[in-house]
């Protein structure tokens, strides 16, 4: 909390949805607004802004086990997924089958469904599992063998935090003339990812969760070096041109991954996200991952002793190697418990988790600012709400964001 904005008497367990505000980001944004934009105006493109994405890509590469020229920062995860899937379909590198599974984040499914219709491909195949806890890898592999092509999976499942075996699935996909597009959104900044060692060919993710980049922070894409020139972005924007400031016609894509740029970079958002990445590098991703394993194990032990007798079920893998950095609880009253935690009681502590349908309470652990004491107090607060039946006083009305 030395490095982040902290609200007194509040325990924040939602870093898996939106990370905290780094104090340095506040200073960086203020300086950018007052000086770079306010005083320097257009001159700041040359003085500060044009090289900003590359600087961030150099830093992200250290966290993701990639080369900087294999990464591109910008746009949103949804837009980037559209560009990547479209480029793969157009390349004919693999058969034009689109496959995902029922654990994937819905926006990925929506994008793939839309592309299948737009490009008149075979309908999207969704591998459905019997539970939300983990993937049935046998079922998934059978579908890949049957319908090889472009597979999109989330490295960490957004509901249960199940962590997919990245390298072995990449190897299996390659053996079956397929490419897996990995969504790293719930993993980046908290899982020790090595895109090279895991033989990953395509990946993307957001930076506003465990990387603490801020709401709407630009996302990133990764394309294995050998694939870059074989793929073409469907959005031919001027920043993807080999010489954007020549303003020449016709469009000639940049040689490297910059061909996946489109419009003008989101400068203020890029400035805001740098402090969070710097803090992750300062802490060290190996240290962050170790603490995440220890803290999720501690939380699960507390849940077993304090909440399981009250009817809660753990919907997160018990093995440290098979989970990301949030723990999911299942109970028919999870929504009202969630509201009670957020509202607090009298002058007591407020706990900020989140809720996912139909009845899941997600407790996100961001090791870079979550303490073991935070975890203990949060679980004791859930127990208090249940034992006193405090949730009976909470209505079931839900806001748009839960």
Q: What is the meaning of each model-derived region?
A:
Residues 1-402:
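Pyridoxal 5′-phosphate
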